[in-house]
């Protein structure tokens, strides 16, 4: 009788549909063998960017931009002014539209050398690009990171143009440092965009909670790695550790800031 019950149970189980792990953006591209280990963060359900439709904005020409962008007046400094306008010309030339199927939701400023978007580079360049907001909504560059947030709050620091994360989330180089709130606060202080603040708040809170859970030591300080901080050319770990890939069992000051 017991054998019969077990046999029926096994046959019934085999007819059930297989549960597919929630995608993290890489599954179909790289056929990752990982099991679903997500502990879902409720704040992620408030992330509107994960379900937003892509919005492509085609920028105007650089000649048109010169009529809109801040026009500095600095007598006797023609070379400096030439550099200023050249910086804007380069920036405008690097505006990209989201690829179809990438999961990106906004046209963005591409700051990298390889076609990927970088959390570190994007956050800092937007502190400059915000002065061109009347010409183009550069701040929306960060929307693409928010759109690729994982169910547990993680956001990869480097994402390919096709939307695929470059690193598994528990890799020591996978994310950080947490510069996006700083970038958003600078933007808010200048423009007072409360609507954007309300939208990004749960996203950034969920990411902060993930970092606090997964990138801190027992005393509450944070760790990172050379690539994780964007400072792989500033070796600081003991010689037995990789200056690029390892946390070196150290407290990383720039990650704690």
For the regions a language model picked out, list residue spans one by one.
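Bacterial Sec-dependent N-terminal signal peptides
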Residues: 1-22
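Low-complexity, Ser/Thr/Pro/Gly-enriched N-terminal "stalk/linker" regions
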Residues: 22-117, 140
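The feature captures the catalytic groove of carbohydrate-active enzymes
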Residues: 26-54, 111, 152-179, 212-257
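Active-site acid/base region of carbohydrate-active enzymes
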Residues: 68-89, 132, 145, 150-154, ...
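A structural signal for well-ordered alpha-helical segments within the folded catalytic domains
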Residues: 85, 123, 136-139, 143, ...
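Alpha-helical support elements that line or immediately flank enzyme active sites
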Residues: 115-149
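The substrate-binding groove and active-site-proximal loops of carbohydrate-active enzymes
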Residues: 119-120, 124, 163-171, 188-198
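Short glycine/serine- and small hydrophobic-enriched flexible loop segments
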Residues: 127-131, 182-189
